[in-house]
Amino acid sequence: KVCKGTEYVIPTFGCQLAANSEGRPEMVGTKWLEPKLDGARVLLVVSDDNTATCYSRNGKVFDNFPHVEQQVLSNVYAIRTYLRIKGGFVLDGEIMGKSFQDLMRQAQRKENVQTQDTVFNVFDILPLEDFKRGFWNAQLRKRLDVLSDMQPVFDAMPNVTRVDSQIVVDLSTEEGRTKLHEYATEMVTAGFEGIMIKDMEAPYECKRNTFWMKWKPTITVDLPVIELEEGTGRNKGRLGALVCRGVDHGKEISVNVGSGFSDTERDLFWKQQEVIVGRTAEILCDVITQNQDGTYSLRFPRFVRWRDDK
């Protein structure tokens, strides 16, 4: 992107992103399955002159993981040897903490930072030069071979590891499709967010496409509405969110639900607040999360419908 009136160029930051797997014709052939981690996506960039920086997938600098950066720098020459390059490289992965909420708080803190126990889970690698171009034509299977060969390096880094628990399936066969569903169930039961489905023959490309696909379960929760919040911006003067609180899945859940409504519903519900309060809403979410105070909330809650039978 070029800023007019100046002589410098603003770099565009990107990385490989996954498409949703539902209904995709690409869900055939040989695929690599791995757990979808519930952490912060991190691109650890090592420059040609041996400086390491952690970036978010949007290019925001993460300053709070120096222990990870230092461990990688301590093994920089070994990593270059396995990758067969002399310059910079990028480790693509996910930083994990004790919980997603705690990790996000620590990642953004300016002081009293406590990230020393976080672990960087690496699932891809590529030369920095190719990352800057937005494309590396090395097949996924070859990139994974590099990571596998690097196991002695990972063993030397207490807070940097390689994503484990992967399998290969052929989704063109009934056996492969059955294995995918069994694996997805196993990973979710183990506490992972879902699974990643990757094309073994695909290159690394810095954009969203079906080279990588993701599958996540959804959960429905039924909670009573205790009050309504007015919206802001274009939703000022009508419903912004339903404030819901109650017990479901054996947990005390409190959450504000601000999506899933049509404009007509926002207007109608706001005008009928006395009728809405006390009704039970069916809410779709990705996962039930625990707050620091021991209560629970929902990740990405969306209103589905009213459950007047409850």
Write out the residue ranges for each language-model feature.
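Charged, flexible boundary elements
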Residues: 1-29, 33
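Amphipathic alpha-helical
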Residues: 164-219
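Short aromatic-glycine-enriched beta-strand elements
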Residues: 232-243
